């Protein structure tokens, strides 16, 4: 009888420890301090590539996220959420749909007001820390991370019209 009690207590302890120490999956991540901190392979802040157009619209509504416009079809369309001034250093997060499926997420990083000199290098370091992996390719204009199903690219671009430098983070399927 004592043996059964011992094994029962050990089993109960194992279950409790598993529940406490099991990390939450990326799908369960709802919000974080910033969209950059919410980057995962295949998604950002709970939105995942392949999610349906309707699901994303309902998620925007549920999370009370203001979006710029709604295309009723979801075919070859874009929704912009989290506009300027909602998060530090973020101009916008764009969700791109094809055939009613989320195919790409683009984060437009704003660093003009902060006056940070090497935001590109800082973002490379930050994304490496978040993803817990090094980039597969990096140069002075772009850096890429890859997983078997998706990839993340950090672009550094100069816009000739405004004379500003912009940084875009794109999450897409492989």
Residue ranges, per PLM feature:
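Feature marks short, highly hydrophobic, charge-poor N-terminal signal-anchor/signal peptide-like helices
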Residues: 1-10
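Non-cytosolic coordination micro-motifs
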Residues: 15-74, 104-174
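Short beta-strand segments that buttress and anchor functional surface loops
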Residues: 78-85, 107
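Amphipathic hydrophobic-ligand
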Residues: 86-90
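Hydrophobic/aromatic beta-strand elements that line small-molecule binding cavities or substrate pockets
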Residues: 92-96, 156-157
């Amino acid at each position: 009888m004592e043996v059964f009690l011992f094994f029962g207590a050990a089993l109960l302890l194992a279950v409790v420890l598993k529940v406490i120490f099991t990390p939450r999956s990326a799908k369960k991540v709802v919000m974080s301090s910033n969209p950059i901190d919410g980057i995962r392979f295949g998604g950002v802040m709970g939105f995942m590539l392949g999610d349906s157009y309707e699901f994303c619209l309902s998620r925007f509504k549920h999370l009370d996220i203001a979006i710029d416009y709604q295309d009723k079809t979801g075919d070859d369309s874009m929704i912009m959420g989290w506009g300027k001034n909602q998060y530090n250093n973020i101009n916008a997060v764009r969700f791109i749909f094809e055939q009613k499926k989320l195919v790409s997420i683009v984060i437009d990083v704003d660093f003009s007001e902060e006056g940070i000199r090497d935001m590109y290098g800082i973002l490379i370091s930050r994304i490496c820390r978040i993803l817990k992996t090094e980039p597969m390719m990096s140069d002075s204009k772009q850096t890429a991370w890859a997983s078997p199903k998706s990839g993340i690219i950090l672009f550094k671009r100069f816009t000739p019209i405004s004379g500003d430098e912009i940084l875009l983070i794109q999450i897409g399927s492989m």
